[in-house]
A protein has these predicted regions:
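N-terminal helix-loop segment corresponding to the beta1-alpha1 unit
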Residues: 1-188, 192-194
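Beta-strand segments within the central parallel beta-sheet cores of soluble alpha/beta enzyme folds
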Residues: 195-199
Length: 199
């Protein structure tokens, strides 16, 4: 028996942070359904490739089921609305406002499943002046001061050394996983239902 057996997760994430979060859930036994656009997650083409498939994509998405849906189409939204009735968790990492435009944000899905845990991962939060800014790990490394800290440990002054591990993505995915796992405990203690913060 795994800790998350019988837990169903709808995974709308791409690249690294979100898939890392949902991979941790799959590792604990959750049924994770990765929902991809017809063009697929950009990580599918990330090098290195083995037998034509990205090893990075495989590492981040092993143990998950896959479903292709064009969320711009009403019939695809209807499929998600049906799936969410039996889901426990939704994780997404679109820019703030994208899921609302699809009609798939927390407020839109909650009537279909009031017990749903919804985690929206973003680089600069869901609200505020920088919310709409795109954020990949190298951007966050620079804006957070991580790169500056790296420079302090270099022997000569130059641009920061490239970080082979996208620390910002791994930490974001790990903290998002923790937020999702903590949500039911918080609800038991407060009787308040709200999205799990993932920014």
């Amino acid at each position: 028996m795994n800790a998350l057996d019988r837990v169903r997760v709808l995974d709308f994430t791409t690249t690294i942070a979100g898939p890392h979060c949902t991979r941790l859930m799959a590792d604990l036994g959750a049924e994770v359904i990765k929902i991809e656009a017809p063009e697929g997650d950009m990580m599918r083409s990330r090098l290195p490739l083995r037998n034509g498939a990205s090893t990075s994509f495989g590492q981040l998405n092993t143990g998950k089921k896959s479903l292709v849906l064009d969320l711009k189409r009403p019939e695809a939204v209807a499929v998600v609305q049906r799936l969410v009735k039996t889901a426990d968790v939704v994780v997404e990492n679109f820019r703030p406002g994208v899921m609302a435009r699809f009609g798939l944000d927390y407020q839109s899905l909650r009537p279909h499943n009031p017990a749903l845990v919804y985690c929206a991962i973003s680089g600069y939060g869901q609200t505020g002046p920088s919310a709409g800014r795109p954020a990949y790990a190298p951007v966050i490394h620079a804006s957070s001061g991580y790169d500056l800290a790296q420079i302090a440990h270099q022997l000569e002054p130059r641009a920061p050394d490239f970080c082979g591990i996208f620390i910002a993505d791994v930490l974001t995915g790990t903290y998002a996983f923790g937020a999702v796992m903590a949500a039911p405990v918080a609800w038991r203690c407060t009787s308040a239902r709200r999205p799990a913060p993932g920014s």
